[in-house]
């Protein structure tokens, strides 16, 4: 069996469906997980889907992916704008990385328009709500090693 695609979500994404639904939509993180699993299955892939509000835990999972994953999808949420540590972990992992955002950061507040994660990402998918994750999984499957 081939290695899975890791799909990692950062802080506050556990609140999807209730937190600012006018920006992030009404689907829950569990809904997003099911969409990703279905897309991966249709592509002959599996995923490992995780969320954490803790930077260190996300870094641990990124480092774990180095040996256990074929590609990585990450929605860093707020950490995208602040975490050089996550950037460094992504650069060290040696895997294709697809950055994913539910909203379009370029169309939001100035501080959201740049992410450190983009410096390590092979590509970025944003602005399509929960479908951003599906598209990111599809891209990661195409890039997988």
Swiss-Prot record:
Its EC number is 4.2.1.10. Keywords: Amino-acid biosynthesis, Aromatic amino acid biosynthesis, Lyase. Pathway: Metabolic intermediate biosynthesis; chorismate biosynthesis; chorismate from D-erythrose 4-phosphate and phosphoenolpyruvate: step 3/7. The active site is at residues 24, 101. GO terms for molecular function: 3-dehydroquinate dehydratase activity. It catalyses: 3-dehydroquinate = 3-dehydroshikimate + H2O. The keyword Cytoplasm does not apply. One of its GO terms (biological process) is quinate catabolic process. Substrate binds at residues 75, 81, 88, 102-103, 112. InterPro entries: DHquinase_II, DHquinase_II_CS, DHquinase_II_sf. PROSITE patterns: DEHYDROQUINASE_II. It comes from the Bacteria. It holds the Pfam family DHquinase_II. The keyword Zinc does not apply. The record marks 19 as: Transition state stabilizer. It is an enzyme of class 4 (lyase). NCBIfam families: aroQ, PRK05395.1-2, PRK05395.1-3, PRK05395.1-4. Catalyzes a trans-dehydration via an enolate intermediate. Homododecamer. Belongs to the type-II 3-dehydroquinase family. This is 3-dehydroquinate dehydratase. It comes from Phenylobacterium zucineum (strain HLK1). The gene is aroQ.
């Amino acid at each position: 069996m081939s290695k899975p695609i890791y799909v990692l979500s950062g802080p506050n994404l556990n609140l999807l469906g209730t937190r600012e639904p006018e920006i992030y939509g009404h689907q829950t993180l569990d809904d997003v997980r099911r969409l990703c699993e279905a897309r991966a299955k249709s592509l002959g892939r599996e995923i490992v889907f995780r969320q954490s509000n803790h930077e260190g835990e996300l870094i641990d999972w990124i480092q774990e992916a180095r040996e256990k994953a074929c590609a990585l999808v990450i929605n860093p949420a707020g950490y995208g704008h602040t975490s050089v540590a996550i950037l460094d972990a992504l650069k060290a992992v040696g895997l294709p990385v697809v950055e994913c955002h539910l909203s379009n950061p370029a169309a939001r507040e100035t501080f959201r328009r740049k992410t450190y994660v983009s410096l390590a990402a092979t590509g970025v998918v944003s602005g399509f709500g929960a479908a951003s994750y599906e598209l990111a999984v599809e891209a990661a499957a195409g890039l997988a090693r």
